[in-house]
Structure formats: C-alpha cells, structure tokens
C-alpha cells in the first residue's frame, strides 16, 4: 500500500474498516491501555480516541493507538499487502547489504534497476514543512498539554512510547533513528531510556568524548509515518539511510525538514516533514554527574516482559521547542505481557529477518521469534545440517550477525524436518534429540537487555543454545533413531477409501 504520510495511511485504513474512531471520552491514564489490550487480543482495528480526558483536563489533540496491532497493518505500513510479502523486503535488504557481482546481462540489469530505485528514493528537503505549522516556545513548551499515556497502575509517570529519536554522532555522516521510551518528569523534560549498545546512546557517548561539557542535540518525532517508524527498527544497511529505506517502503520520497533550533540545525538534524509533533532540545551538561550530563532515575514501568522493570539512571532530555501540524494527532502504545504491539511487530519483522539470515547462512531453512518470547528473547532456527557441530555454528552466527539479536537469550536449533511455527514439533525435537549435558551451550557475561531482571547484573547476563538436531558421527557413538513414517502407498490407499469407511 502506498501513502504519503500518517494521515493518508489512516484515511486508507479507515476506508477498509481497519481503523475506528471513539468519540466517547476516554482517559489516557490506564483506560486507553485496557481498551487497546482488548482490541489487540481480538485482532481489532486501530483506534483514534477523539476526546482524551483525564479528570478535569480535556486535551485538544486525539490519540492514535493500536496502529500496529495486527501483522497485516504492519505489512501495510511497510508497503506490502500481506505478511508473506515481507520476505521480499528482506530479500531487498539482503541484496543491498551484501550485493553480489552480476553473473550476466540479465542480473546486471536487475542490479541497475535496484540501484536506480534506491537512488530515486533519496529524501528531499522541504522549506515549509507541515510539522512546523504551529510552534511552541518558551513558557508555551508544556508536555502536559499532550495526552501522553500512563499505561499501568504501577507506572511512575506518563510515558512517551512511539517517539522517533533523531541523533547524529560527531563523526557520523548519517543520522540515527531509534525508538526509545521517554518518561515525562515535568513540563519540558523527559528521561531518555536508551540501551548502551543502541545508536542513540552510542552517538551521545561519542559526543561526550569529542565535545565534553557541550549540550547534545536531539529531535524527537511523534506521529511519523509508519514506514519511517518501521525503518527505525529494521536492520537497514549502513550504506542506506532509514529515511531512504522508508521511501522505498512507502513508494514516495521522504520529505525532511531542518529543525528550527539553531544548534540542531547546525548539527544537521532533519525530521520527517509530515510528522505530527516534533520535540527539539538537548541533553544538558551537569558537572556533578559522573558522565558530565544530566541524568535522572527512570521507572518503574510495566514493560513487554509482563513485569514492572527496576529503576535505573538515564539521560534527561530538555525540550526547548515543540513544533506540530495543525490539529495534531498523538501516536501512542503500551507494552505488557505478550501479546502487545512489540510482539506483533516481532512476528511481522521476523519475515524480513529470514532472507537476511539465509543470505549469510544458506543452510538456514526457517527462523522464528515466538511472540511468547517477548519479541526477541527466544529464537528458533531450522537448518539443513551438513556436518557435526554445524548447529553450534548457526547459534553463534545468529547471535552475532544482526544487532537485533545481541539480546536474544535462548536459541533452539532443529533440523528442517521440524515445523518451527508448531510448538508441539519443537518440543518433540527437544525432548527426543537433546542430551542436556552434550547439546546445551552456555555463554556467560554477554550483553542483555536492561529490562531483563533475571540476569545477575543489569545489562550483562548469559545465553543458552540448545542443539535439537539429529546427531552425526562425532557427536554420538550410538545408533541414532529413525523417525516413524507410514508407507506412502498405504497412505494413498487409505486416502482413496476414506470417505466410504464410516458410512
């Protein structure tokens, strides 16, 4: 599906019954979470809450929620019509990530066509962007005027969830786009919770080293178009900007606007011109903090694990200017025990990951991130095994190839006769093909999500790999079992007489 921006996407969803509007007052404090949780579990539509109300406070802007509550809407957001078509996006990314020399004129022509399509989607700058139709400055900057959700009863504060954070490191040609949650702590400050290994945190660290004591510029886009949001969580090759990739998905070049704050403009931070709301500001210096910059204690918040996370210290982002479209829409979500939107996104993006992994490891037959595994904490891999120890090579390959899987705790590898999408078959393979001492790999002191309270220390824990493949000589000295399979002729005979057997 092609579209121009978020509003065009919503209009198309509404025409097909994929979006509904709620005109009854609903509170962003807990009530929207409960409504959206019920919608998501029933594979219901996206929803626009037209009248957000929190007690006596009435908000001027509606709230969009449950946008990515089904895999079909995720696919539509990525320019596809179905989940199956996302494999084609993965093939495109794998070709862009590691292009191969053409083996003939036909392949050369395909390579040229692909390169031209990428080139044609280079983002373009616009001078009068919609995202700057309204500007709040000075005392007008007040985040309490935005209907930010408080998702769960034990949450510490309202939480910005779909903020597209735009940063640039001091030595980077390309901007980084990332989705990081942000706790609202007062009218113009949020706590920026980013993991130490993610792009935004790396840009900030490089800035602090290269420019100690200097404010770090940040822009946050709220209500960006789906392709740009999804591009930020997709393994885009370093040679391709997320904005350019979003244009490929959307079918139209991404329009960008230069931030109004002079220091952000000087840092060449560019934001989606069609975004609903833009936050502009800095992480300010603080000589009293060991990092040299302002930090605050974040959390606790209910998270995609299904638990409240422990508190930790993260940088404070001071918002100095807010720009927006006329009649802006605030895009929000919640996270909780699966299923939630991150789990749905994981199922959809799984189809993008498969061709990328297969390009690097052709022996991989299928790859699956079960939604019960909290998006990425468990991965299942089926493979065409070729030698003893092959499964362990694949385990370490998955952990190291894409940065999305550096936090994966469990990897189970099976043969290609096992259907990964059927837990009954996976459990059968584990219980019949695994000796726990021989076939379990434990790796200690590896990067782990800060939200994983099961790890011994924050951000550092262990990983487990389970080799549930049939064992080859060298892996066992015993005669290996042969699966029971019915004679094909007998099956065909019973098929032919089945309808008459019980008459």
From Swiss-Prot:
Membrane topology classification = Peripheral membrane protein
Family matches, as InterPro entries: UbiD, UbiD-like_C, UbiD-like_N, UbiD_bacteria, UbiD_Rift_dom
Q: Name one GO molecular function term.
A: 3-octaprenyl-4-hydroxybenzoate carboxy-lyase activity
What are the GO BP annotations of this UniProt entry? ubiquinone biosynthetic process
This chain's function reads: Catalyzes the decarboxylation of 3-octaprenyl-4-hydroxy benzoate to 2-octaprenylphenol, an intermediate step in ubiquinone biosynthesis.
The record describes how the cofactor is bound as: Binds 1 prenylated FMN per subunit.
From the UniProt record, give the pathway where this protein acts.
Cofactor biosynthesis; ubiquinone biosynthesis
Keyword Thylakoid: yes or no?
A: no
Q: What is this protein called?
A: 3-octaprenyl-4-hydroxybenzoate carboxy-lyase
Q: Which family does it belong to?
A: Belongs to the UbiD family.
Q: Which positions are annotated as binding Mn(2+)?
A: 176, 242
Could you tell me the superkingdom of the organism this chain comes from? Bacteria
| Named cofactor requirement(s) | prenylated FMN; Mn(2+)
Concerning HAMAP family, the annotation shows: UbiD (MF_01636)
Residue positions of the active site? 303
Q: Name one GO cellular component term.
A: cytosol
Q: Where in the cell does this protein reside?
A: Cell membrane
Q: What gene does the UniProt entry assign to this protein?
A: ubiD
Q: What is its EC number?
A: 4.1.1.98
Whom does it interact with, and what assembly results?
A: Homohexamer.
